[in-house]
Amino acid sequence: MANVANKYAKALFDVAIDKDRLDLMYDELSEVSEATKNYGEDLRAIDSNPNQPASERRKFVGIVFGDANYYLKNMLMILANNRHLVLINSIFKEFKSLYNEYHNEDSAIVESVYQLSDEELDRIKDLILKQTNLSQVHITTKINPELIGGFRVKVGTTVLDGSVKKDLEQIERKFRRVN
């Protein structure tokens, strides 16, 4: 289903670029995703109910998402027709990835043993920007006591590991090679 979500996201992204409404589309799709994120099972039930015709699913979309811009509402109607309403959050995730790539931005998860100060986060942000050549990075922090000390950064598929745990694991591997 991720491939299906990617196709919807790419189509919506292309329309948003073509109509010069990328930021508006991002904001509205973000709101729709946020509003539906806790209703996945309900959307799945709507999609899978064989007794609910497409006209009722479209009516539901019109009532719930009536204020959405024309292009977003059109995509939501297509989702209703194709019984893919459950994909809304996956579509936003894919759209966000395209949006970030377009703006040379990405999200990063910074793990540390303790809550990092703003100054530490700024230094880590600068490091991430230098290592990745991104123009902007959005940081989410996570406390991970298993690191023992230092920090670990995940940006997409890249991991920058400056943790004490990693250092200890490297020392352990060296000792094993010697023995």
From Swiss-Prot:
InterPro entries: ATP_synth_OSCP/delta_N_sf, ATPase_OSCP/d_CS, ATPase_OSCP/dsu
Single GO MF descriptor: proton-transporting ATP synthase activity, rotational mechanism
Gene from which this protein is expressed: atpH
Superkingdom of source: Bacteria
Family: Belongs to the ATPase delta chain family.
Keywords: ATP synthesis, Cell membrane, CF(1), Hydrogen ion transport, Ion transport, Membrane, Transport
Subcellular location: Cell membrane
Lineage, uppermost ranks: Bacteria, Bacillati, Bacillota, Bacilli, Bacillales
Membrane topology designation: Peripheral membrane protein
Quaternary structure, from the entry: F-type ATPases have 2 components, F(1) - the catalytic core - and F(0) - the membrane proton channel. F(1) has five subunits: alpha(3), beta(3), gamma(1), delta(1), epsilon(1). F(0) has three main subunits: a(1), b(2) and c(10-14). The alpha and beta chains form an alternating ring which encloses part of the gamma chain. F(1) is attached to F(0) by a central stalk formed by the gamma and epsilon chains, while a peripheral stalk is formed by the delta and b chains.
Protein's name in the database: ATP synthase subunit delta
PROSITE patterns: ATPASE_DELTA
Assigned GO CC terms: plasma membrane; proton-transporting ATP synthase complex
Biological function: F(1)F(0) ATP synthase produces ATP from ADP in the presence of a proton or sodium gradient. F-type ATPases consist of two structural domains, F(1) containing the extramembraneous catalytic core and F(0) containing the membrane proton channel, linked together by a central stalk and a peripheral stalk. During catalysis, ATP synthesis in the catalytic domain of F(1) is coupled via a rotary mechanism of the central stalk subunits to proton translocation. This protein is part of the stalk that links CF(0) to CF(1). It either transmits conformational changes from CF(0) to CF(1) or is implicated in proton conduction.
